[in-house]
Design a protein with these regions (language model features):
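One-carbon transfer enzymes
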Residues: 1-270
């Protein structure tokens, strides 16, 4: 059985959905795993979204560990968390010292692991791009796709490192961003300057929103299918590298078929 740790800020429905799809699969016997703990860098009463998230965690009877990064920063008199990240990470590691795991998941975790934390708690992270795609926030990624008139987008699951979005990849899903549903949206931005589009529309640009939505609906099944691969022993992590069942470093697994099958069975909804 795969023993998982779970890190999340728990800001909204996306974080709740990622936890639920995995916890529900465990309860159904579909995923041979258990969630040993959920860590949240907020505390009860700090944010309504996080409070909802903590209630969800408790409904699954999963041990919940909290330590407010905002309160820690203020207590340290630091201008930002980055300047005291390693000290914060050490306190988190102390809180989790007795909770051993095989693998951890960053699912809506708003902080970046420092080097020591990344080594101590080997974790998987989601990034909204294909393995050879852009890095950065989801907004930066999609704007770059639009600017380059890219043919596809996707989501990758990789090992979290202190080098943001550059950890060794484990799995991915990709999907076309031209064709049905997309072509009219591309036509609406044809020949227009990317900076002008950002200034006028920002995140409300229909093409940007549609690419984002298609990526989001694939995140949950991608995470679940990836954890199934790890639970089966097909993949594992050794020396912070993704390796196959023989212990050989391997390329990321494409899970397009599994993800699209899940979406089709759900009637295209998540």
């Amino acid at each position: 059985m795969l023993r998982l740790g779970w890190f999340s800020t728990g800001r909204g429905w996306g974080s709740r959905g990622l936890l639920s799809v995995v916890a529900d699969a465990i309860q159904r016997g579909e995923l041979d795993a258990e969630i040993a703990f959920v860590f949240c860098n907020r505390e009860p009463g700090e944010h309504s979204g996080s409070d909802e998230y903590m209630t969800l965690v408790q409904s699954y009877d999963i041990p919940l560990v909290t330590h407010s990064s905002q309160r820690f920063r203020k207590e340290q008199g630091a201008p930002n968390l980055a300047s005291v990240r390693e000290a914060y990470d050490r306190e988190v590691m102390a809180l989790l010292a007795e909770l051993t795991t095989d693998l951890n998941v960053l699912a809506g975790y708003g902080l970046i692991f420092g080097a020591e934390m990344a080594q101590k708690h080997v974790s998987l992270n989601l990034h909204p791009a294909t393995p050879d795609g852009p890095i950065g926030t989801w907004q930066q990624v999609i704007w770059e796709l639009i600017e380059n008139r890219a043919s596809e987008s996707g989501t990758i699951i990789h090992i979290a490192t202190e080098d943001l979005d550059r950890g060794p990849p484990a799995s991915y899903v990709s999907f076309p961003i031209h064709g049905q549903g997309f072509d009219d949206l591309w036509a609406a931005v044809a020949g227009k300057d990317i900076d002008a589009l950002k200034e006028k529309h920002g995140e409300e640009l229909p093409l940007l929103q549609y690419i984002r939505a298609e990526g989001l609906r694939r995140e949950r099944p991608l995470l679940l299918e990836t954890l199934k691969v790890f639970a089966s022993g097909r993949l594992s992590i050794a020396d912070r590298l993704v390796v196959d069942s023989d212990g050989t470093p391997t390329s990321p697994i494409c899970l397009n078929d599994e993800v699209e099958r899940t979406l089709a069975q759900a009637g295209g909804s998540d």
